Swiss-Prot record:
It comes from the Eukaryota. Mg(2+) 1 binds at D69, E98. GO terms for molecular function: fructose 1,6-bisphosphate 1-phosphatase activity; identical protein binding; metal ion binding. The lineage of its organism: Eukaryota, Metazoa, Chordata, Craniata, Vertebrata. This is Fructose-1,6-bisphosphatase isozyme 2.
Amino acid sequence: MTDRSPFETDMLTLTRYVMEKGRQAKGTGELTQLLNSMLTAIKAISSAVRKAGLANLYGISGSVNVTGDEVKKLDVLSNSLVINMLQSSYSTCVLVSEENKEAVITAQERRGKYVVCFDPLDGSSNIDCLASIGTIFAIYRKTTEDEPSEKDALQPGRNIVAAGYALYGSATLVALSTGQGVDLFMLDPALGEFVLVEKDVRIKKKGKIFSLNEGYAKYFDAATAEYVQKKKFPEDGSEPYGARYVGSMVADVHRTLVYGGIFMYPANQKSPNGKLRLLYECNPVAYIIEQAGGMATTGTQPVLDVKPESIHQRVPLILGSPEDVQEYLSCVQRNQAGR
């Protein structure tokens, strides 16, 4: 093992990575501008999250967002940061946010060709107890010549140009894919830059962890109940799966990516259409997981194949290691056949 200097002289920062990808694609530079603006917003949100207690940013703002969640002060700040940074990149035309009832249309003089769907601060109900939270985003090209409208955002996840998430935990991390695998970058606070820490991440074929909110067991359908029972009490005498659930989707998904296993937010009696939003929660993480060799399904079809009908549409989400997700789908098929 060779000695390494504590100071890297040829580090691959995320800014450099994005520029290199743009050069390789012989693009116009708009996507590069867009991604760099998104990264600036993420750095600002990371700083705000770490200062939240000192800056009086804990607590609720007194309103409820379009999907029925209480809006936290940090939600409002993060949403404004992302919108302002993306619009000032001169590369977007339509923005869809969890916090806005309608799509945000970029002013004509600032318009570009990209549509961005994002959740500025996922897991914000965990802010006050200092649990990990995150930012999620997916980028699409506008496919029509018409005036920009929210219809431009109603594209299946297969059309994603780039997607990723930021995780604000013990460190700030970005997972990013531009369609050629998944790379992980860690924020170096001394440099103020994201630095590559893992290239072409691959999820395990099979894991040892299942993740879902068992508090809703009363409402589980037969397939979900059967699958969870199999993980807790294996019929073949093998070791049971470990149970892990943070309640912040980015944290749960990232753990699943790193350690393998399965993350589940299936449909149930209480939420027959699922609870997570397709455009800015499910599609981005499904894209990341698939790019890493995993699977993401609604239980009836791949998440990325769903054709959205509205910008805040909800769908069930089951993702993770391919063998684990396939086992869940076998439970679904078996229960459907038995009806």
